[in-house]
Amino acid sequence: MKKVKAAIIGSGNIGTDLMYKLKNSKVIELNAMIGIDSESDGLKRAKEAGYEVFDNGIQAIIDNPSLADIVFDATSAKAHSYHAKILEELGKIVIDLTPAAYGPFVCPAIRNNDFLDKQNVNMITCGGQATIPIVHAINEVANVTYAEIVATISSLSAGPGTRANIDEFTITTKRGIEEIGGADKGKAIIILNPAEPPILMRDTIYCEVKDMDEVSIYEAIHKMVERVRTYVPGYSLKQEPMFDGNRVTVFLEVEGAGDYFPPYAGNLDIMTAAALKVGEEFATQIVSEKKRGVMNEAK
């Protein structure tokens, strides 16, 4: 199968981790790594790996539109708001790994292929990718009236982009809890833990439900965990769900694959693994459409 060309904008922690994941993709060929700091570790690693590198940001795509059909934006919410319009005009499929929420939210464990007609999709946040599937699973069987999540990540795994987007993180994750998770009302909190040695990503999900059914909720949570594990193997329950009246509390832990950052950075891993899965679905569709076009021409 001919691979679909892609580029990454943003050579920070998330962009660099994604670079290593794309290396093993069977349907996507990473063509370029784009940043704004020629001395960044991400651009240096990309150059060493043999990828074309640019340090002039979005201008690289403007000057070389044939670089990629799919663009992964791993910059910041503010930067993506500027990039989105340019990439839309250039006809690029955009997978946004910032909390900009310019396009519709996508969580691969919840939505199947109903995003493939969109040009720009948003991967919510790392905390959202970890917790929203659980909120959704509970809501499917018990009607969640309120959901609150606390995402705790190692301070070392939070780069400048993450730190600059704390407000956007809470707002976008809250929206995702409600719009994708299905909760009537949501709330999100992020904690950067400076502990040494660094802790694994940990997430607490607290839900108030209208229709309590412990057995159905328990089964729904476990099924969803297994679904997420198909693309994030380090995703797991820290302990069994806790029930108290109309309240359910779930404790998660996410261990990263160690592609770029050590395994404690599960927050990077769940974001990039989810983006890779979504990108590969877009790439598969592009290849299928091209094949169909060739067959129609042959007729």
UniProtKB/Swiss-Prot annotation:
Entry annotated with the keyword DNA damage: no
Keywords: Aromatic hydrocarbons catabolism, NAD, Oxidoreductase
SMART domains: Semialdhyde_dh
EC top class, as a word: oxidoreductase
Residues where NAD(+) binds: 11-14, 157-165, 267
Biological processes annotated in GO: catabolic process
Catalytic activity: acetaldehyde + NAD(+) + CoA = acetyl-CoA + NADH + H(+)
EC number: 1.2.1.10
Catalytic site positions: 126 (acyl-thioester intermediate)
A molecular-function term among this protein's GO annotations: acetaldehyde dehydrogenase (acetylating) activity
Pfam families in the record: AcetDehyd-dimer (PF09290), Semialdhyde_dh (PF01118)
NCBIfam families cross-referenced by the UniProt entry: ac_ald_DH_ac (TIGR03215), PRK08300.1 (NF006157)
Stated family: Belongs to the acetaldehyde dehydrogenase family.
UniProt protein name: Acetaldehyde dehydrogenase
Species, as recorded: Bacillus cereus (strain ATCC 10987 / NRS 248)
